[in-house]
């Protein structure tokens, strides 16, 4: 059962208005991820939606993140910067495997301490902190 946490649309809108490129990287299969995002109108709030493959070539979070990077032309050597935002250990581990920091969302599905144990650089407890924490990260 999928839902959107209260305040997420407003936080995403603020980040988009401030010029951030936003992408969803999910381990849900792409063919499921896109319709779910469309149902909640997330497709209008982000720049891209990337999910796992049907042929099992892209299952793990780091594989999905790398696939998203390839599609958007992310180039760290050219100065591009990214931050993973997630609510499970798979997000933190996937970020680490791609050389990224992970901002943990304490309101999600993680067990207490899970995000910190897996290397999230910070865990926030309220949706209302999201945009400002991301903006602070990139200053």
Could you say what each language-model-derived stretch is?
Residues 84-124:
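Acidic, Mg2+-coordinating phosphoryl-transfer loop and its flanking beta/alpha structural elements
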Residues 43-58:
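A short, structured active-site edge motif that brings together acidic residues
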Residues 3-7, 28, 87, 107-110, ...:
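Short beta->alpha linker loops
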Residues 61-94:
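Conserved Lys-Pro-Asp/Glu-containing loop-to-beta segment of HAD-superfamily phosphomonoesterases
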């Amino acid at each position: 059962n999928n839902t959107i946490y209260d305040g997420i649309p407003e936080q995403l809108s603020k980040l988009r208005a401030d010029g951030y490129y936003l992408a969803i990287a999910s381990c849900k299969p792409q063919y499921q991820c896109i319709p779910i995002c469309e149902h909640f109108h997330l497709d209008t709030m982000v720049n891209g939606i990337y999910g796992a493959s049907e042929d099992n070539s892209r299952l793990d979070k780091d594989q999905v993140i790398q696939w998203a990077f390839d599609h958007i032309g992310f180039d760290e050597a050219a100065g591009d910067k990214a931050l993973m935002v997630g609510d499970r250990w798979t997000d933190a581990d996937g970020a680490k495997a791609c050389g990224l920091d992970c901002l943990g969302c304490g309101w999600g599905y993680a067990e207490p301490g899970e995000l910190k144990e897996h290397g999230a650089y910070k865990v926030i407890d309220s949706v209302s902190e999201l945009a400002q924490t991301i903006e602070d990260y990139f200053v």
